[in-house]
Every structure is written in structure tokens, then in C-alpha cells.
Amino acid sequence: MGVPALFRLLSRKFAKVITPVIEAPTEKLPDGTEIEPDLSLPNPNGVECDNLYLDMNGIVHPCSHPEDRPAPETEDEMMVAVFEYTDRILAMVRPRQLLFIAIDGVAPRAKMNQQRSRRFRSSREAALKEEELQAFIEEAKQQGIPIDENATKKKSWDSNCITPGTPFMDTLAKSLRYYIINKLNSDPCWRNVRFILSDASVPGEGEHKIMEFIRSQRVKPEYDPNTHHVVYGLDADLIMLGLATHEPHFRVLREDVFFQQGSTKKTKEERLGIKRLDDVSETNKVPVKKPFIWLNVSILREYLEVELYVPNLPFPFDLERAIDDWVFFIFFVGNDFLPHLPSLDIRDGAVERLTEIWRASLPHMGGYLTLDGSVNLARAEVILSAVGNQEDDIFKRLKQQEDRRNENYRRRQQRESNQESESYVDNVVIQRSVETQSTEVVTSSKSTSVDTKPPKKTQKIDAPAPVDLVNLSEKTSNRSLGATNRELINNRAANRLGLSREAAAVSSVNKLAASALKAQLVSNETLQNVPLEDSIASSSAYEDTDSIESSTPVVHPIDTKVSNVGQKRKAPDSTEENENTDTVRLYEPGYRERYYEQKFHISPDEPEKIREAVKHYVHGLCWVLLYYYQGCPSWTWYYPYHYAPFAADFKDLASIDVKFELNQPFKPYEQLLGVLPAASKNNLPEKLQTLMTDENSEIIDFYPENFTIDLNGKKFEWQGVALLPFIDENRLLNAVSKIYPQLTEEESKRNEDGSTLLFISEHHPMFSELVKQLYSKKRQGKPLKLSGKMAHGLFGKVNTNDSVIPNVSVQCPIDVTSADALQKYGSIDDNQSISLVFEVPKSHFVHKSMLLRGVKMPNRVLTPEDINQVRAERSFSSRRNNGNSYRGGHQSYGVRRSYQSQSYSSRQSYTGVTNGFANGGVQPPWSGNGNFPRSNASYNSRGGHEGYGGRSRGGGYSNGPPAGNHYSSNRGKGYGYQRESYNNNNRNGYY
């Protein structure tokens, strides 16, 4: 998920980072046969890719519940959809060296809190959706509308099964193994490409498995620094992870989530599966493929070079260190592991505010905030203190902005009140002739809520039995008084759409009746094909789509003229009862005491408890940064609160001793029990299900049927905080250990840690040597280290894996029915590939945040006009924040200053404001304006000339005082830094 709305922010602020993907067209022969493009030809996007990495969860989710077509009815159909989706990505990217497929395995405990919240919300939404469907069926029956009972009884697919340890994930792993083998055997384009599969049995989040692999390759002396990487995924944090690699040839591939094909709002008929007989286009309707886009990290680096540059520093400016700092302070705005600081909202310009504070503070901090994933807490306190000084003003301004939005909304509501009150029923005007008993239907041209697609001229058709809309609404209103769930549905709808509860109920009933009437007008036949998933609108109604899992689906029980439900915040109607009163009132004096009392249950006379929350949050910041830059520092650490402290309370941070114990990840079943609600119990073995449902279970309190969602000042439920109890690890492990002996062999196997697999075709240059060495009698099962010419640029250890060997038959693990699928995914009679157990090499040294020697930087893309635009926005941001209580006021680029180049140990010079290595430096294309005249001085890539120590005896990361950060491992490994120092005479930086 990452930082909510980050992708949208970057695509708007730095427009050129986004470019469309060019896909080679499929050639069609006269007989209708389609010929796929030749993928061995140069990539039409103009850039060749060496390594492609697939964050597979970003493929499974859109394939399991697509937006542009009916959802697959079986898991086998889902697997075929996954194959086809992956084929499309391969055709776009055309990797020449490696394809790395990573599926989310067991996540660190810090991530499980977010996963638990998301899955409980999903279960709650499904229950409300089912309740609403039953209400619709009841209303339809009262109107005499026959409903297909088989369709209404269809069980919805539980997306919570996309979690390690479930039978679905086991099927996915088997299917992908077959997919890879099939590719290597049937498609000559991929015979020289190596495939690596890290499935859900291998612990770790998919994107972090990918980053661990990239880091492991970078540290090898033989690694090619000009390797071109592409990562596919929908999580916004892939952008930050891409920056954290310091690989300039790096792109992120993703669907264009903002692409809209026509109207984004489905009609009632479409959502309920009602087919119009007069709409012949429906049968020929072909879904339009959603386009893909590149996010170019190299161009983002260009933008950040301008955005983050600070003149007149007492130490040399280092772009790599500045980027690391930028990645770090964006964590304050929110991430998957910590709640965002109360005063920092990305939609309120928090990123720009933090950037401005950082630029103003950097000259006075003595150095950068971070070093290779470790935080200097004393300097971090400078930034947080500056934010804290602004908190009062921020909260007041947010309240003023909200009041203005509400007032503007009320004015619009007043102007449109007549049209709004008529709502959906005005779309259809019925005139019934007493003499002819026929009806004339006229469709209003003003309607925007429903696409009725009327005939070209008015028609007369036989009238159905009359429908009493008024009586229906009265009956429903009376009946809903005692229906708790139904009332909840209407209340939720009213809260989202800015309607009163009464208006929502009446509107829902009126439109239900109108929809039923229209269906009768079209046909008196039985309504068919009303699946549970499509019966009531369900969409990802969130403000910014940064991840396929970034929000909970929101049920829409009523139709309205508001088409962008959940995308644009709506002010409440003046008549609405405010059920979610903001009792904290951050904009009024005394908010600090109210906030801690209500959110943390801490009274004003307990400052030590606030300090404890601050310590936990600081640990969280250090944990997240290490996770991004070095790998998981602790599998068991987590932030034990639902909310973050105020920035003003982050004081004396240098005295906080930050240490982590690595420990071990959960087993898959332990994670399932930690994140799934009881409604998803079927994803677990039957013996373990009792822990979630038996009232005598020792952990039954982990699975509440009802829980509170605190809107926390927001408008929509998905923005709120799910107040679920935190899992007690010891109680969970103790309970599950008693049941493990009762599991079957197959069930126990799904709970075991698996291995990463490497697949190679017989035609690959390294195949023969690998087989010769691995299967020799001398080897006797020992792993083989890939190095030298045999490695062909891939480093790690491999060992035999007898599950896939050459010259044997391989069966497709899924049942395919379509002729096309049968042709593509049949049995492989004579396998010509091999799979090996692959071990990602473990480094005993800290991964350095630096460009590698010998890298050739991409050509610059930004023009002087682009750079001036960034400058102008910086200047505007500075003026807007001028006068706030942090040092520096506002800055501009209009200062003539010598910008020093960087000198690496190779004696090559990297010109500071350019992104290119060259002997003697490369003059930046926009330096002619005099702002950045080049200097002949050179300095070390580390910017602050820090010294780097070797292994620490204590086994830990350490910046030394004042930060005092440590990283320790119960496995006895650890690495340390010496204290940061600035030394004008030190040019190499390493000693």
C-alpha cells in the first residue's frame, strides 16, 4: 500500500515522471487469426529491460475481481486470467535477462496490524452487502418481480484467501510453477531468460523480497551498474523502494488507475445484472484494456535534484543523501506500519511542508537525517520540532478550509434542491392511458445518474401492473425502524453522500421501485443472472487509488446524482444528524489533552505515558527506514497504538535507545489467525477454525463480531481507524501449538516455509555447467555458489530440486475449458527446463546508499522550462510558509554559488547537479543561467565525509551519540558505523 495518495501527488507535481506504455499491436489475418507480436524485436518503448520484477499480488487482485468484466467464476479461471495478465506485462517489458516473480509471504508483525484492519473491514463490508442484497430481494418480491433463486444463492468469493497459508495461495504457487515451465518450453523468446519464483511459502512481502534481491546483486563486484530494472506493482511504496536502491536505471510499471472508459458509474440495471432487450450493443460489448504507464525513477531523481537542492551549505550537497532524507520524512505522512502524524495530511500539502522545513533546517543540522537506513535522531528532532511549532496553525487552517467547503456545498445544495429532491424518479415519466391501458415512456434528457438508453422515438408498450411508490416507501420506512442492519446501511449511505438518513431511505426505495418498474416495462420475464457480487454496487471508493489493497470496498446502497462517490469529499447536509461528532476539536484550545484522553486513554497528569508512545513511534520510524534500506530488522516488532503522537511531543530523541531483535517470522497459519476475521475461517484447517469461533477458545477475544471505526475527523468510513484489539503473540502461539499435532500431512505442509526457485531452459548458456556440477557424485547435495562466468550476471547459491527435471512430463495443475486455454496450457510431455533451489546471497556489510562506480546515467529529460516550474513552485511554497516557526524562512534558487562535483575512488567526477558520470564532469544543461557555475573542487559521495566502521562487536547498527541507534540480531550478526564526522581533508570517506 505505502503512502496513500503519493502516486497521484508525484504524477501531478512532477508530470514528466509518468509516460504511457507503448504496446505492440496484434496482427489480424483475414481469417480472423491473431498473430502475437515478435517479442524478440526491440522494445517499442525505446528502452530495453534486463530484469523484470513482478509483485504478484498486484496481478492477482485485479484478476480475481476485475473492473471491466465479470469476475471469474472459479479459481481455475482466475489462474488463466493471471497467466494472460502476466503475458501482457511480459510483452510490454520484454526482459532480456531475468524475470523475478514475488508473491507476498508472511509479513513482519508490524504489517499485520494493517492487514488485520483491512481484512476485518472487508468482512464487515461483505456482511452489509449481503444484508442489502436480501433487502433488495425482499422489496422485489413485494413488487412481484421474480428473482432467480440460484443466482441469489451464489456464494461470493472471499478475497481474504489471498493470504499466505490458504489453499488458494497453494494453487497459485503450483499454477505459476507450471506457467514458467510452459513458457520455457513453448516460447523461444524466453529460452535465454531466467525465471525466479518466490511464492507465498517464502516469508516476506513481495516488494521487499524484490528489493532484497536487488541489494544482494549490487554488492557483488561483478554486478553491472547499468542494469535496467522494471518493477510491476500497484503499491505506491514501490516508488520509494525504487529510490532507495539508488539504481538510476529503474522504472515502475503499473496500470493507469485513473483511466476511465466513459462513465465510471454503473446503472442500476448493470449492477443488478438486468439485461435490456432493446440494447443490442451489450452482446457485442468488448472490454477495453486498461492502459499501463511507466513511472521513471531516473526522471523523478531529476526533479528531486532541483526540489531538494540547498545552496550555501557548510558541507557539500549530496543528492543521494538528500533523496534518502526525502524518503524518510515522507514516512511521517503515513505508511503501512505507522499512523501518520495528526498534523500531516498528504492532501493538505504535508509533503511540500516537510520538504520546505528540511531545506530550511539542513544548513543548521550539521548533516543529513539518515545514513544508509539509519536515522540521526537529534537531527530528526529538528524537523519534528519545526512541524510541532506549526501544529496549532495547521489545525485551525484545516478547520477553516473544511468550513468553507461545507458552506460552498450547502449553497450548491440550495440551488439544486428542487432537482435533487426529484432524484431518480424524474428520469422516467409514466403516462398511463385509461382507455388503451398503454404507457408512454419518456426519458429525461437531464438525467446523469442512469444511462437508460431510450429508443429513438417514443414507444407505446403494454403497461405492467401499477407500482405504488408512495405506499412502498411508507412501508419500507416503517419496517426499517426495527431493522438495525438496514438502518445502518442507510446511515452509511447518508454519511457518504451528504444526504439525510430520511432522504437516503426514501431515495433508495423510490429508485428500487423505479428500477423494478423499468425492468417490467422492458420485459415481464424472470430476472436472471443476479450474482451476489454485482447485485449491489461495490467499488473501491477512495480518494486516491495507490494500491489495489489500499482501501476497503465501500457499499453503495442508493443511486444518486453524485457520480464520483467516495472520490470527492462531501460536506454533510444541514439537516443531517451528526453521528460522528468531532469531540477532539483539534482547532480549539485544549485539543492536546482531549486527543490523548480519547485516543490513547492518557490523562494530562501522565506525561510518562505520552513519552512511552513517542518512544514506540521513534522505534517505528527507525524500523521502517531499515526495512526499506537494509531489510527487515525485526519480524516481531510492531507499533502498539492506533494513533500517532503530536509532533510537538517528539523531544529529547537522542536519548532514546533504539534496538531491534531479529527473531523469526510467524508461520502462515499463525499469520492467518492474526489477521483474518472469523467470517473467513474457511481459509484455515478445520481444527484451527475453532480458535476463532468456539466461545471457550482462549483467544476468542481476538475476533470481535462488532468493532468501532473511528472516523477521526474524516468523512468516509474507509478513512477511519478500525479499533481492533492487538494480537497477543504469546497467547496466539500457545493456543495454536496445541492444535498443530492434529493437522493432516497436507495441512501441515501448507504451514511450512518454502524455498525460492530458479528455472532455466536447456538452451540457456549456464544450463550445462550447472547440471554437470550439481549432479556430480562429488557434490553430494551441497549448494553451488554462482560466480564468475558461470553466473552470467546472477549471484547466489543453487541446489538441486527434484520436482522439475528435464525430459519428464509436466501436467497443468488447473482445469481449463476454453479451446484457446486448452491449446496454450496443456500437458508438457518432454520438459526441457530445470528448477533449482535458489538462495539469495546474504551480505555481511551494510548496503550503501550510493551510485555505483561505472554507472552511465540516463539522458536528462527535464528542460529549462521544467526546472523553472519546479523553482516557481518551491518559491510559492516558501512564501506560503514564510513566517512559520522554523528556521530559514523562504529560499530561492537565485543565488550564484559554486556547486561542487563529487569524486569517487575511481577518480571519476560526478557533477553535482547533473546525474552523469564523466571524466572531468558533465556540465548540466541548465547551468548556463549562472545559478550553478561548476567548481573544480571535489568531495566524497557521502556528502558529510562520514567514516564507516567495520563489524560492530555488539552486533548492531550504530550512529553513535547523539542518535544512539542500534540494530542487533539474535543470530549473532550485526554491523556498525562510526559516529558521523565532517572532515574537510578527507576525500575518500572510507577508512
UniProtKB/Swiss-Prot annotation:
Q: Where is the composition biased (Basic and acidic residues)?
A: 404-418
Which is a Gene Ontology cellular component entry for this protein?
nucleus
Among the GO molecular function terms of this UniProt record, one is: 5'-3' RNA exonuclease activity
At the top of the EC hierarchy, this enzyme's class is hydrolase
The protein's UniProt keywords, in alphabetical order, are:
Exonuclease, Hydrolase, mRNA processing, Nuclease, Nucleus, rRNA processing, Transcription, Transcription regulation, Transcription termination
- Tree of life domain: Eukaryota
- CDD domains in UniProt: PIN_XRN1-2-like
Per the Swiss-Prot or TrEMBL annotation, the motif Nuclear localization signal is positioned at: 264-268
Q: Tell me the compartments it is located in.
A: Nucleus
- Check the record and name the InterPro entries matching this protein: 5_3_exoribonuclease (IPR027073), Xrn1_helical (IPR041412), Xrn1_N (IPR004859), Xrn2/3/4 (IPR017151)
Q: Where is the composition biased (Gly residues)?
A: 946-958
Q: Its GO biological process terms?
A: cleavage in ITS2 between 5.8S rRNA and LSU-rRNA of tricistronic rRNA transcript (SSU-rRNA, 5.8S rRNA, LSU-rRNA); DNA-templated transcription termination; mRNA processing; nuclear mRNA surveillance; nuclear-transcribed mRNA catabolic process; positive regulation of chromosome segregation; rapid tRNA decay
In terms of Pfam families, this protein maps to:
XRN_M, XRN_N
> Region labeled Disordered — which residues?
404-461, 547-582, 872-991
Q: Which residues form a coiled coil?
A: none
EC number(s) recorded for this UniProt protein: 3.1.13.-
Q: How does it assemble?
A: Interacts with din1/rai1; the interaction is direct, stabilizes dhp1 protein structure and may stimulate its exoribonuclease activity. The interaction also stimulates din1 pyrophosphohydrolase activity, probably by recruiting it to mRNA substrates.
Q: Which family does it belong to?
A: Belongs to the 5'-3' exonuclease family. XRN2/RAT1 subfamily.
Summarizing the function annotation, the protein's role is: Possesses 5'->3' exoribonuclease activity. Required for the processing of nuclear mRNA and rRNA precursors. May promote the termination of transcription by RNA polymerase II. Essential for vegetative cell growth and chromosome segregation.
Matching entries from PANTHER family are given as: 5'-3' EXORIBONUCLEASE 2, 5'->3' EXORIBONUCLEASE
Q: What is this protein called?
A: 5'-3' exoribonuclease 2
